[in-house]
Amino acid sequence: MDYPHEPVHYGRVMAKQHSPRFLAIVEAARSEISECSAADLTALVENGALVIDVREQHEFAAGHYSGALHIGKGVIERDIEKHEITESDKIVLYCGGGFRSAIAAKSLQDMGYSDVISLWGGWRGILAEGLETTK
C-alpha cells in the first residue's frame, strides 16, 4: 500500500521534530516493508492478524488498541520468541505515528518474519479512526 511519506498528524501537532538521521532510518525501513492505515486494521484483525504495540510501557498503559499485545520496540527482537508467534503469522505493528513500528517491522523481517505490516499513522490513526481502545 502506498502511504504518504510525511507524518500524518490527524489534527494534532507532533510533540517534537524528528532528527534527519532518524527520519532517514525510517524511510529506509519504509522502502522495504508493507504498511497499512488504521482504516485497514479491523479487516486485518478479522482475518487473523496479531496486533503488537511497540510503544513504551507507559504509552501502552495510558491506552492501546483493544487486544493488542505489548512488546516494546527496544526489546522486540529479544522478546518476540517468548510469545506464540510463528514466522508466517500476519503481524501488524503500531507505535505513536508509524515511525518506530516501521523500524521494528524491518527488524522482524530481517529475523525471518514474512508477513509483518507497520500501521502508518499509529496510535494517532487508531484514535482518529475511532477504533476500539482500552487501558
Go through each PLM region and give its residues.
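Rhodanese-like catalytic fold shared by cysteine-dependent sulfurtransferases
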Residues: 2-50, 57-90, 97-135
